[in-house]
Structures are given as structure tokens and as C-alpha cells.
Curated annotation (Swiss-Prot):
It is an enzyme of class 6 (ligase). Coiled coil: none annotated. ATP binds at residues 39, 80, 470, 507. InterPro entries: PRibForGlyAmidine_synth_PurL, PurL_linker, PurM-like_C_dom, PurM-like_C_sf, PurM-like_N, PurM-like_N_sf. The gene is purL. It catalyses: N(2)-formyl-N(1)-(5-phospho-beta-D-ribosyl)glycinamide + L-glutamine + ATP + H2O = 2-formamido-N(1)-(5-O-phospho-beta-D-ribosyl)acetamidine + L-glutamate + ADP + phosphate + H(+). It comes from Saccharolobus solfataricus (strain ATCC 35092 / DSM 1617 / JCM 11322 / P2). This is Phosphoribosylformylglycinamidine synthase subunit PurL.
């Protein structure tokens, strides 16, 4: 049957039902109980993310298709993150494109208008031609769908590691806007509502939820990958927003198809669906396939009978299929019928309550023996600053229509955060962060660290974080070392979000990111955070003679850093001191609001050296003294490449003001250098390093590699 359930789960089903399910019922159970849809190995831990916040309209406790927060003036922001990792490994164009389509439908299922997308892409070594092919097609798929549907891609991440050679990670986040009294649920609260399906059902995506809930085998069928149709997606978007007032609930058809959507929308009630009423793309489809097909560009609506005609007429204007396929019932049973015969008859509470698993854990933390770092500075500078993680991502952004709808305020790559304008005149900053190298060293500190980094990134444009979603991407949870890091990352994320009082209103868990030899990816939890610009927006500007001020304390912490990864330097992972992240961020926000700085960048990937390099790519030079860096080490390499948390560099004409402001907040800051007109020259302790080749590499690397791949 191709069922992905464990023997213990199959025995549990037989016990609960008191009978043997038929083949179609097994396929339904396999979809609804899949890890992808049920969170059976993670849900118990995800509950710890819940924060009671007056701004939360729809949060993690509601378990809906997207989260929503109040932003004032009667408006709400809707936010969601998803991935399409396994499909993108098989068919990168359609895998990535359907990832965009799915996240858009999650946003409109709340009645919200999508206003921004972010893409977070991780692929393997670009010296391998397959990875070049994957990246080309992933970016092309995202661009094709986002550009066609009219939602701008405003930012994201693009990074590279051998761990992703067989398992690219393709994450997409979306932001939507809606009047808060117009938000739609994804579940019903009464029987008698008609189930209306928009869109054609085909044979693509069969078993997709189950496919996403196991490791890649090397023998996976292309049929498990859905096919994207952005023009149909645009119709779904426009009509859904048009008819939102006429429907009671909206549910995207994603993983598990109708099997999952119908089960989840009932909210514990029941439903009866007549399969022969479902519009088909392929004639004479197997009724069982119809139930679990994951054909894209479909939506399910729960509608009062009196409004059904008006809802379907809206789709008919676009010649888009719309049909009443069933109804919500009081009897808590999910029934799929074909020409009067029940093919599926399963209790709702059985489907909605899969077994929960707590797998064994194994502490994989290692006691690292610190060694004196003895590297030639020039070699460290050249090797770290030419790493693909740090080069310009302009090659990717140039393929996106990031200014469509004219809401984009800060262009992709121009700052540490994307910024979009909202209907109430406010500005919303958005950022995504992950740190798999740090997570491989310490899941707990990594969990705290990615939240803190996202918070700092928002601060660099003058925004304060207010809401987040997470995506937790790991290997097989049944492996004790994988599950341990997963649990530790959740502990760190939860601690940090509670500290910053930032509610996580939704997210996703993606397990089984392994190759066919069973090698898992590095643990890759991801945070997407959004927040309102508090007063003034900072658009980075570099000028001659500005002072370089380092805000925050540098520590001898190279573990998980880019330097330690490249040169294999054993070191402890940084300890994330959340109070320092908060206070240094407040210094930066205050400095922006007072008009005291022209440029701000957090210190993270690549350390202080990478942050200084971001000034050089503006066409200037920088001179610094490492003796002026406030730190616990005299080692120049450690000062320049440590990735300690809680730090920024800012450019200012009033450096003493920044130092005093920092002191008033309980944070250290020091004047470490000055900007000059010596283009491409980084002067460190009176020694000039000509970085022209590195600057050229920064702008040209991806275009050259992707053009030659």
C-alpha cells in the first residue's frame, strides 16, 4: 500500500476502530497522521512556545493555517513560514514554486492580502554541478510564482554547506495584511455548512505528505511533487479575498489534500464528501487518489447554503472550477463517498488525535579543548570574506520583482532587514535567521541565538520585534542525537522569545532531512521575526570621515563561527546573553530615533571583519584599531572573527554620544576606527589590506558561478 505508518500506529488504529481499515482509509490515515501534518513527534514541545500577549489574535494555541497579531488602527498582520524541501530536491523549479503558492494560500485563508515574501535557501557546495542546477531552478521557481502572482520577494537568506548537498532547504515566509475584524478561521464551529471546493484535482502530488515525512531514498517518484500554476494561483488569491465575507471558514489544500483539509476544517465535527462532485483535471481518476491528491491552487470553503451560489459565481467569472462537494455534519465522522458508497468512514477524533511520540535523546555536547588561534591575518581575512555565505545575493534578488505593489521600502540586500509599508502608514520590518553551524555545536545556545540575531537585525532599521514564526528542520527524530538537538533548540527558542516577549504565532517542523545513506543535515531551526519601526527608519548611508563605533562586548568565542568551520578550529559555542542583545538593540534604536547614526549592522556571520567589510562594498575604506575593541582577548583573529552575540557596528559623526548612550543602558561601546576614501582598503592596526579582489568577488561570485554552471 505504500503506507509510511509505524507498526505500533497501525495496531493503534485497529484497536481504536475495532476493525481493519480498508485500503483507502489507510491512505487517509497515512496522510493525516503523517509527521508533516500531525506533528506527532514535536507537538508536545511546541506548546512551550505559547505566550499570552494582548496583541495576539491568532496564535500557536489556535493551531490555524497562519498566525495573526494586532498592529493598531484596526489592522492585523498575518504571518506564516513553510518549506518544500523534499519536493525541491527532486524537482527544484516546481518544488520551490509550489512552496510559494502554498504559503500564499495560507495567508489568504485568513482573509488577508499577501504583501511580502521572503525566501531562505540552503544548498550544498557550488563546486558540485548538481547544486548549481538546484539553486538555479529553485530561484527560478520562486521568481516565476512570486512575480506572476504579484507579491514581492523582499528579502531572505542564501547560504551554502556540504550538509545540504543531497538535501536543499527551501523555506518561504509570507506576510499579509487584513482588518482584524475580518480575519477568517480555518475551522468551523457548526454543522450544516456546505463544503465548496475551488480548483481542479489531478494526479500530481500523490502521497506528498507521506513523502515529506521520510528520508529521501534516491528512488522517489516525481509524482510526489506538485506542479505549480501561478496564474491559477492569482485567481484563487483574488477571488478568495473577494468572497471572504461570504464564507465561514477557509482552508488551503496542502499536504494530504482533501483527506487532511476536510478533517482539519471540521474542528471535531464531521463531514461527508461526495467524490464524484469533485472537478477533475484527469478523467477517470481513482477515487482514492482524488482524496489524497495534493494538486495545487485549490481552496476549501465552508459556506452557508444561502451564499453558495454567490461564491461559485465569483469563480465562474474567471472560468475557474467551483463545486459543492459535501457538508459539515454533527456526526463526528469523516466520510468520503463515491456514487453513494462509503469509501472512507473514520471517526474525526481518531484522525485528529494521532499517537504522540517522545523519542530517546542523547546529549551530544562535547567538551572542547580551547587552542591558541595562530593564523595569518591576511589568510583569515581572504578566506572568510570570500566564503559564498558572505557574497552579494544580487544574482537572486535581480530575478524577483521586489517592488511590485509599491510597498517595498528597503530593497533586498540594502539592510539587515526588509521593510514594507502598511495601510495604516506604519512600517513593518521582517527578518529571517538561522545558524546551522552553531546548532551543530549547541542546540540550546543556537535556539537563543537565532532569536536574538533576528531581534538585532530588526533594530538596525529602527524596528522592535513583536511577533515570530519558526521552522525547525532536522534529520530523523528517532535518532537520539538528532532529537536531543531538536529539543534543546526548542528550549533555547522558547527562552529567548519569552525574554523578548515576542509570541511565536505559528511555524513548521520538517524532520527526515537526510540523504539515502541516512546522513542528516546540520540542525537548521529558523526564526522569522517581524516588528514595527518605532519612530524613524534608518536607510544605511556611508560617508567619508564617519566614526566606526562598536556596541557590545566581544568574547573569545569562535565555536560555530565561519572561521572555525573553514579552519576547523575547536572552540566553545558562544553563550547568548539575552540581556546584552536587548540593551544593545535599544541603544541602536534610540540612536536611530535621535538621528545620531547613518549606518547600523549587527555583528554575526563572519564576525566584526564581515561587518566592517559591509562598509567597504559601499566604495569606501575603513581604518580600525583592534586595541580599541572592548573584549576578553588580545588575539586579533579572535577579536575580528568571533561571533559573540549582542553586538553592532554603527557609523556616526557623534561617537561620544553613542558611547554615553550605551553606558546609560549598561552596555559597553568604543570608538574603533573611521571611514575614509581609500577604496577597498581595510586598515587594521596601521597595516593596509587591499581587498579589491574580495570586493570584486562579493559582487560577481554568484553571477559567475551560476553563469558557468
Amino acid at each position: 500500500m505504500g503506507i509510511n505508518l509505524l507498526p505500533i500506529e497501525m495496531d493503534e488504529i485497529r484497536k481504536r476502530l475495532g476493525r481493519e481499515p480498508n485500503e483507502t482509509e489507510w491512505r487517509v490515515i497515512d496522510a493525516v497522521w503523517s509527521e508533516h501534518c500531525s506533528y506527532k513527534s514535536s507537538k508536545i514541545f511546541l506548546k512551550s512556545f505559547s505566550i499570552d500577549s494582548p496583541n495576539v489574535i491568532m496564535g500557536i494555541k489556535d493551531w490555524q493555517d497562519a498566525g495573526a497579531v494586532d498592529i493598531g488602527d484596526g489592522w492585523a498582520v498575518v504571518i506564516k513560514v513553510e518549506s518544500h524541501n523534499h519536493p525541491s530536491a527532486i524537482d527544484p523549479f516546481n518544488g520551490a514554486a509550489t512552496g510559494v503558492g502554498g504559503i500564499i494560500r495560507d495567508i489568504i485563508s485568513k482573509g488577508a492580502k499577501p504583501i511580502a515574501l521572503m525566501d531562505m535557501i540552503r544548498v550544498g557546495n557550488l563546486k558540485i554541478k548538481k547544486n548549481v542546477w538546484l539553486l538555479k531552478n529553485i530561484i527560478a521557481g520562486i521568481a516565476a510564482y512570486g512575480n506572476s502572482i504579484g507579491v514581492p520577494v523582499v528579502g531572505g537568506e542564501l547560504s551554502f554547506d556540504d550538509t545540504y548537498n543531497d538535501n536543499p532547504l527551501v523555506d518561504v515566509a509570507a506576510i499579509g495584511i487584513v482588518r482584524k475584524d475580518k480575519i477568517k478561521p480555518s475551522i468551523v464551529d457548526k454543522a450544516g455548512l456546505k463544503l465548496v471546493l475551488a480548483g481542479l484535482t489531478g494526479v500530481d502530488g500523490l502521497g506528498g505528505a507521506s513523502f515529506a515525512s521520510r528520508k529521501l531514498s534516491g528512488e522517489d517518484e516525481i509524482g510526489a511533487v506538485q506542479i505549480a500554476d501561478p496564474f491559477a494561483g492569482k485567481i484563487i488569491l483574488d477571488v478568495t479575498l473577494e468572497i471572504a465575507d461570504k464564507v465561514e471558514a477557509i482552508k488551503d489544500l496542502g499536504g494530504g489534500g482533501l483527506a487532511v483539509a476536510v478533517t482539519e476544517i471540521t474542528n471535531g465535527l464531521g463531514a461527508t464528501v461526495d467524490i464524484e462532485k469533485i472537478p477533475l483535471r484527469v478523467k477517470n481518476m481513482n477515487p482514492s487518489d482524488v482524496i489524497i491528491s495534493e494538486t495545487q491552487e485549490r481552496m476549501l470553503y465552508a459556506v452557508e447554503e444561502k451564499n453558495v451560489k454567490e461564491v461559485c459565481e465569483a469563480f465562474e467569472e474567471y472560468e475557474y472550477p467551483c463545486s459543492v462537494i459535501g457538508e459539515i455534519t454533527n456526526e463526528p465522522v469523516i466520510k468520503f463517498r463515491y456514487i453513494g458508497k462509503d469509501l472512507v468512514s473514520l471517526p474525526t477524533n481518531v484522525l485528529l488525535n494521532p499517537p504522540r511520540f517522545l523519542w530517546p535523546i542523547k546529549n551530544t555536547k562535547k567538551n572542547v579543548e580551547e587552542k591558541i588561534v595562530d593564523l595569518p591575518l591576511e589568510s583569515a581575512i581572504y578566506t572568510v570574506l570570500t566564503h559564498p555565505d558572505l557574497v552579494s545575493k544580487g544574482w537572486a534578488y535581480s530575478q524577483f520583482d521586489y517592488e511590485v505593489n509599491t510597498s517595498t521600502v528597503v530593497k533586498p540586500g540594502d539592510a539587515d532587514s526588509a521593510v514594507v509599508s502598511l495601510p495604516n502608514g506604519k512600517l513593518l520590518a521582517i527578518k529571517a535567521d538561522a545558524n546551522p553551524d552553531m546548532c551543530a555545536e549547541d542546540g540550546y545556545e543556537c535556539g537563543k541565538g537565532i532569536v536574538a540575531e533576528a531581534y538585532r537585525n530588526l533594530a538596525t532599521v529602527g524596528a522592535r520585534g513583536m511577533v515570530a514564526v519558526d521552522h525547525l528542520q532536522f534529520g530523523d527524530p528517532k535518532k537520539a542525537e538528532v532529537y536531543y538537538t531538536f529539543v534543546e533548540a526548542i528550549r533555547g527558542i522558547g527562552e529567548a522569545t519569552r525574554f523578548f516577549n515576542i509570541p511565536i504565532v505559528g511555524g513548521k517542523v520538517s524532520f527526515y532531512n537526510e540523504n539515502n545513506q541516512g546522513r542528516p543535515i546540520k540542525p537548521t531551526p529558523l526564526i522569522v521575526m517581524a516588528g514595527l519601526v518605532q519612530d524613524k527608519l534608518l536607510k544605511n548611508r556611508v560617508e567619508d570621515n564617519l566614526y566606526v563605533v562598536s556596541v557590545g562586548y566581544t568574547r573569545k568565542e569562535l565555536g560555530g563561527s565561519l572561521l572555525s568551520k573553514i579552519f576547523k578550529i575547536p572552540s566553545q559555542a558562544p553563550k547568548v546573553r539575552l540581556q546584552e542583545d536587548l540593551l544593545s538593540s535599544e541603544v541602536v534604536i534610540d540612536s536611530i530615533n535621535e538621528g545620531k547614526i547613518t549606518f547600523a549592522k549587527d555583528v554575526s556571520r563572519g564576525g566584526l571583519a564581515a561587518s566592517l567589510f559591509s562598509i567597504l562594498v559601499h566604495g569606501y575604506g575603513v581604518e580600525i584599531s583592534t586595541k580599541s575593541i572592548l573584549s576578553d582577548t588580545d588575539n586579533v583573529i579572535e577579536n575580528l572573527f568571533s561571533e559573540s552575540s549582542g553586538r553592532f557596528i554603527v557609523l556616526t559623526n557623534e561617537p561620544e554620544w553613542i558611547v554615553e548612550k550605551s553606558k546609560s543602558k549598561g552596555i559597553v561601546a568604543s570608538i574603533i576606527g573611521r571611514v575614509n576614501k581609500k577604496t577597498n582598503i581595510l586598515t587594521i592596526d596601521n597595516i593596509d589590506y587591499n581587498l579589491k579582489n574580495i570586493v570584486d568577488n562579493y559582487f560577481n561570485f554568484l553571477e559567475e558561478v551560476m553563469g558557468n554552471g
